[in-house]
Amino acid sequence: MRMKKILSVLAGLILFANTTFAEELSIEKQLVGIVGAINGTVKTETRTLKAGDKIYLNETIYASENSGTQILLLDQSTFTIGSESEVVMDTFIYDPETSDGKIVASVKQGSLKVISGLISKKNPDSLTVEVPEGTLGSRGTEFQTNVSKGKTDTLLIGPGKNNTL
């Protein structure tokens, strides 16, 4: 009787472990781009980044003092993250066959320079950057924003179809 109980508990544990392991394997991270260049120390919540590393949806990128990185997104947009910055890739939807999609990033602190890629060239309203004071739309152009102590400064660099934010 005791042996049956032990075997039942072991079978239950094995079944639970296999189910949990299978669930973990099915959770696939969504790739949004790669690190093209890096200077100094740039990290995510779980790793220190180097050139060629993949960037995934919902990752927070932290650039320390005197550091920065350039992220090349799958739609050919470029995000350059400056020193002492914190940027999150919130939304990335991209169909490479049609260039349809949507990109949303958040700048919590520091600087982000954006050069629009295929998604926002097709639909200028489809790339936005959230900052503490509101939302910036790229409108198919190039811009840089800096968030410091809750205040946001934004520079329109251009060129863009409408050259507006």
Where do the protein language model's features map onto the residues?
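Bacterial N-terminal signal peptides that target proteins for export
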Residues: 1-7
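Flexible, surface-exposed loop/linker segments and immediately adjacent secondary-structure boundaries
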Residues: 22-64, 68-69, 73-165
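Intrinsically disordered, low-complexity segments enriched in glycine/proline and serine/threonine
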Residues: 7-8, 62
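Intrinsically disordered and other compositionally biased segments
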Residues: 8-9, 22
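Bacterial N-terminal signal peptides
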Residues: 9-17
